[in-house]
Amino acid sequence: MGIYIRDVVKYVVLVYILSMSRILISTMHRGDNYGSALQVYALSEILKKLGHHPIVLDYIPKRINLNKQVWGLLKQLFLPKSLGDIKGAIRGLAITLTNYRCYNTFFKREVSLTRKYYSYKDVAKANILADVYMTGSDQVWNSTYNHGIDSVFFLKFAPEQSRKISYSASFGKEKLDDWEKNETKKLLERYEAISVRELSGKGIVNDLGLPCQVVLDPTFLLNKEDWKKRSLSHHEKDKYVLIYSVEPDKQSVIQVARFIADKLNTKVFMVEWGHKPYAGVDKMISLVDPLMIIDYFLKTEFVVASSFHGTALSINLCKQFISVAQARFNTRVKSILEIVNLPDRLVSPAEFDLNKALCSINYSEVTQRLNIARENSMKFLKLNL
């Protein structure tokens, strides 16, 4: 009898799995930053909640290929020009490999992945079958960032008659260069439904003569309570201002954070992938599980962000924050701040005003706007899946 019941349960589970739509997501998740990891995690969680079976295409472009990074460091180690090169290579190898293991553990635990692919040719040859092919979020359509148009992120490998949609894709800039307009249009014409993350992205797609909708970044599809339940706790006792920046030059961001921390009588913590020490920072947060980063956001007194996801998480988790303008690609941050009516939270270091920065954000209006945008974003997914 027990064996019979187990067989019935297995059969029911199998039927349920087979009834789920298999969605292949092509997104930028291997960028070695927490925002990229959290956005694909959130999208997968929501698609599962909607009754689908999301699978992430484990595509690793050349520019972020671990083998290439390790080979470069080994070359520096065995063909050094100075003692500093040797020390730097050893440190770099330790950090790179630990960082890879950290993200790999997270992805294996939380997200369904295909095998690894390293080129469009490899993906096209694989003939991966799915009910829906989806371009996911982050700067998948940014030709500057991707060193050209990356056909994998435009689903060129998907069968011609297959269903293709995008969710919260980003061009990361205000307009396309002339050289990429025709090819981008041809690739997007194959899509059944297009949604982008920024208002400027909608303008780009509309200018190509195609319909488009603005939706929220996937991290917003999980609300504050959702993230609280999923976060991994840290055990810091000190109060702190949190820096979340992906900018290479962090000195101006640190200076701003230091002003705020001194006023609030707190320490300064900074999320930094390589444990590199910075003057003015009391603690580096690095090589931890992406879901622990959420807890650092939840428990901070204030966030100084200089990235899209640093800004997005601050808003979604209802934190007091400012977003320091980056050297480029600020359109991403401007767009989300406009959606929640917080344009004044974007500041340049040269125009930083401590008193304005510390003006408290009233999250009642922000939450209302966010809930409306979240509902519209969910409607897009439900309608097109």
Which residues does each predicted region cover?
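Active-site anion-handling motifs in enzyme catalytic cores
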Residues: 8-385
